[in-house]
Amino acid sequence: MIAEIGRGNFGRALLRLLNTHLADWETESLDKAPDSSRIPNIDILRRARVVIPAVPIASFGEVLRQIAPYLQPGTIVIDVCTIKAHTARQMHSLLPEHVELIACHPLFGPESLAAAGWQLKGLNLVIWAERIQAERYDRIREGLRDLGLNVIELSPQDHDRILARSQFLSLLIGAVLVRMDIQSTEMNTRSFDELLDVRDTTCHDYGILRDVFRFNSACDATLAELEKTLGDIGAELRKSRLPGPG
């Protein structure tokens, strides 16, 4: 059985994917971590072979603390948060050693899944064996490839370094476009339409942007470089402007 924790936008999308593409597995969705008054949730966690906490990065550690006592030996916990090094450290420090760990980042969300008709072919997914038997990890990795996913193996540290100069940058630029209230015009070029696509695909992700910056220290350098570069380009443009008449 697969136990998915979290019913936010991505949690609901993940549950739909599991029910669609892994229909032969029993799947249960938990709205929150268990407590003593929610015995069914505890029973689900004890029976689960795979547990996927699809929760915000800021609450990931607390969810791990709450589920840790109920995870059985050999249970696989798969982290699907946007940031990997921080959550990998939390899994190692908060979960018992008899639990196996996989770090995973699906590089897609509900909007892109809906646009793809909820099919996985060609979508990117980062994965890393944090603490798991090699044969079990290999079966999972190849199973994901069989679903059509483009599986990328990256350590959490490499993942976060690359993300700081890719996804973080697109989220940051999208937030700038939203704050500037950039809108479509009757004079759109193709490149401007693509810029609006960045705005539209990231306009609901400010919370993710904030968490990515908060929990990925590599983003500091990217933000500082962007600020400096914009300042340098602005200064160059103003310097190049021809003086007005007189």
Q: PLM features: residue spans?
A:
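NAD(P)+-binding Rossmann beta1-loop-alpha1 motif at the extreme N-terminus of oxidoreductases
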Residues: 1-43
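Active-site capping/gating segments
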Residues: 30, 102-136
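Rossmann-like NAD(P)-binding element
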Residues: 42-71, 76
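Short glycine-/small-residue-rich Rossmann-like dinucleotide-binding loops
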Residues: 55-57, 81-82, 130
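Rossmann-like NAD(P)(H) cofactor-binding subdomain of soluble oxidoreductases
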Residues: 65-114
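Internal alpha-helical scaffold of NAD(P)-dependent oxidoreductase catalytic cores
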Residues: 120-202
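Interdomain hinge/lid region at the active-site interface
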Residues: 184-246
